Amino acid sequence: MDIFSGLFSRRDNTPRPDHVTFTLAQASYTYEDGNTGLHDTTLTLDTRRTAVIGLNGSGKTTLLKLLDGSLTPTSGSVTICAGEHTLYPGSCKDRKRVEQLIGCVRREEIPNSFYRSENIAKALDAHMQARHIADAERQARIGSLLAQLDLSVWRDRPADALDSEHRHLLAIAAALCLDPAVLVADEPTKGLDEIGTAHVARALFALDRQVVFATHDTDMITRPEYAIDRALLLDGGRIMFNGSPQDAVTAYTNLIRRMRDRA
């Protein structure tokens, strides 16, 4: 059985979408404790590389989880347009298709099952086998992922032997197992030094994938080699700026300055 059954089946010669369009229509999310993670937001995201910046608690993670279907909006709607198909990431009927379409990266978090495997190659193999990917395809994909993400020399090492930098890379590899069209990444370089950040960022943006990611690293989003197309600045669960990365960083700097002046 190939990796894309149904909507994105490779057996019916339907290719993986080159990109998707996320649409939020008056979407909001309120947590059980009453805190609003995202206020009513109307937004369309279809650029190749979109950065989301903001202070802790500004709503970045809430927004990304609404995009990848981990959260369902309290009000309003979130949809994903992939070719001629429209999916609702928070709905039960579209959940499997959304999981095939979107790869989720959460910092350096990897599935718990990876720590029970003898080594990371076997961990990736088991992860794909559980999703009914054929053996030949699994082996080809494992080799490709490990090479692309500079993990080949670690293939026979257990996950808990990896340093933080390579766990970040392994988290990306895990997210790519189903050959998704888009990666939604929450702080994919968090906690790394300058060298580690550059290594992970180069690997992430070298992939032939649409990427929506949250970060505190304003230098990274303006580096020309990463070709970030667009940046959103969030504050208090609201989008305060939507435009070029350079202008977003300026808006972010001004926001922090105003907060300090009020303190």
Placement of each model-derived feature along the sequence:
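Catalytic Walker B motif of ABC-type/P-loop ATPase nucleotide-binding domains
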Residues: L183-E187
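Helix-to-loop junction immediately C-terminal to a conserved catalytic motif
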Residues: D68
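Q-loop/switch helix immediately C-terminal to the Walker
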Residues: E108, Y115-A130
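Conserved ABC ATPase "signature" region
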Residues: D125, E137-W154
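ABC ATPase NBD Q-loop/coupling interface
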Residues: S77-R97
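Hydrophobic anchor residue at the start of the ABC signature
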Residues: I172
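Conserved ABC ATPase signature
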Residues: P158-L162
